[in-house]
Amino acid sequence: MEKENVFQKLMGFLNKAGTAIMMNLLFLVSCLPIVTIGAAWSGLYGAVRYTIRGDSWFAGFKYGFKCHFFRNLIGWIFGALVGGYALSRVYIGVMNIMADPAIMSAGVVIPLVISGVFALAAMLVIAVMLPLGMYFPQLDVNTWLVTTWDIIFHAPLQCLVVVALMWFPLALLIFEGLLYVYTFGLVFLAVYFVLVTFIATILLKKSLLRILKLYPREEEE
């Protein structure tokens, strides 16, 4: 009897691990065109939601990707442009200061801080906006943006944790000395983003439930 229980638990674990890997592979493939990263995140959140409630994860991914493609496409591109430009300014500024500390002045530090604020804001918005678009497709654009910032202000620490986890692979690619990215990258990413999505769902659950009371979710097809 004990052996059967152990075997069942092992098979259950392997099944969940296999599902997580398949979800991640589909997510990574969907991200290849770059502009579809927003829709792919929405699809991954849909897959996680469907899995939690016992439905087909593929159906959830398809629903999230298809139904929120254009909205998350716009949100992702805008956030990526703002955040990417701001991060590049921060990177250039920090490199210049490290090369010559004597150049530090208000004219250098203030733009650096402003760029950092814009970069953080863009990363926060992307991290919260994409799951919000999946959970509440009926929100119009203005309400969507306002609600995104509402979540950020009501749960700042949770949102920062989600941002840190979401952008961690990018940091590894930039500072590849922290990990042999090219050797273990695919194995690392094979389960990473699903874990991030589960964690983000848990951390933002209270905020999402609070918003659900204000904007009841439409039935999914």
Which functions belong to the PLM regions below?
Residues 1-112, 123-128, 132-221:
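Helix-coil boundary and N-terminal low-complexity module in membrane systems
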Residues 114-118:
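Cyclin-like alpha-helical protein-protein interaction core
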